Every structure is written in C-alpha cells, then in structure tokens.
C-alpha cells in the first residue's frame, strides 16, 4: 500500500468475472477498511493473545485462518490466485506475476531496485528494520519521481542489517539519484559505504 500498487491490484481483482457477478467492488479487497476483510482480526490475519506476565503471542486468526478476508472475497481469483495468495507473494514473485500490468509492475520494480524484492506484499511496515524502512521511503520517491529540481536526501545508517550485496545495490540507487541532480547526505559507519562517498566529514 505504501507505493499505492495495491490500489491497482484491487481493481484487477474487482474486474474479474467472478467479482463482477458477485458485485464485489475494489474496496472489498482492502485489508485496511471494513467490507471484505475479516473483521475479527481487522485484515491482519493474526490475533494477539495477552500473556499478562510474559510477552504477548501472535497466532493466526481463528475466524479467517490467517487469510485476512471473508470467504466470499477469497472465492474470487485472478490468474488462479486469491487476494491472500497475492499478499503472500514476495515483491520479486509479484513482479513476475504482474509483469504485463505496467501500473503494478512499475511500482514493484522500484522496490526491487532498492533491494527489497524479498519482502512480502502483505508484510506489515512495523516489522521492517530501520534500513528497510528508509529504503521503502526511497522506493516511494522513485515511484513518484519527477524530473527537474533536485532534492536533498538524508539517511541515518541505511546499511543497518544489510548484506554486503544489498549495500552495493543501495549504493547504486544513491549514485543514480546523484546523477539525476539530487544530493544525498548519509550518517554511516560501514567502511565500504564510506569509501564510496564523494565527501567524508
């Protein structure tokens, strides 16, 4: 939802013959608003058990079995997949699945370009590391980027928790921003990253 790709996915599901026949609108495929989502878990697919003297435990929702939506919504399929199946896909898998749908695939490619292809579409932003959250915001900018006046980007240790290969992907994305007229200021301790900087303070 952060890149607004989910709006286009919901429209694709609502345009299927099964959805039209059942008069299911795009709103029913949203896990953020009432309608088609499971109201017991409010579209999260999980419920929290309070353990009082221990840490709370998250378990699959009893009502929907962790599938987030009501049964009649889950009956609708797009290319043999339910809406929950799509939420369970990684960004990489979804990019292939929606390759011929430019409105969706272009936004997913922005996520892949910043090295977030391993995230699932239904993953909560609260589970992301600080570095992942920063790269998600960067992908959001890339999806909406307009040519012209440059912007200043500030990053606070964006390599936290990243594999060396992912760090090189991130460096490539930041180099791309600079080459298009933007400025990038980074607080960082990773020596490979620092070695790539134009200026070190």
Residue ranges and their predicted role:
Residues 1-201:
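Conserved phosphate-binding elements of NTP-dependent enzyme cores
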């Amino acid at each position: 939802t952060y890149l607004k790709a989910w709006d286009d996915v919901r429209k694709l599901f609502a345009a299927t013959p099964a959805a039209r026949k059942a008069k299911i609108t795009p709103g029913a495929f949203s896990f953020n608003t009432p309608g088609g989502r499971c109201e017991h878990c409010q579209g999260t697919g999980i419920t929290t058990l309070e353990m009082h003297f221990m840490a709370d435990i998250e378990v699959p929702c009893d009502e929907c079995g962790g599938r987030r939506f009501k049964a009649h919504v889950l009956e609708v399929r797009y290319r043999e997949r339910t809406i929950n199946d799509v939420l369970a896909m990684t960004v990489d898998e979804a990019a292939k699945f929606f390759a011929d749908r430019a409105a969706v695939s272009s936004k997913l490619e922005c996520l892949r370009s910043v090295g977030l292809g391993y995230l699932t579409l239904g993953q909560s932003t609260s589970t992301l590391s600080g570095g992942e959250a920063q790269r998600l915001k960067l992908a959001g900018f890339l999806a909406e980027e307009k040519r012209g006046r440059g912007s200043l980007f500030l990053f606070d240790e964006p390599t936290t928790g990243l594999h060396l290969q992912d760090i090189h992907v991130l460096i490539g994305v930041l180099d791309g921003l600079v080459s298009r007229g933007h400025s990038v200021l980074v607080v960082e301790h990773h020596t490979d990253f620092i070695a790539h900087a134009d200026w070190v303070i």
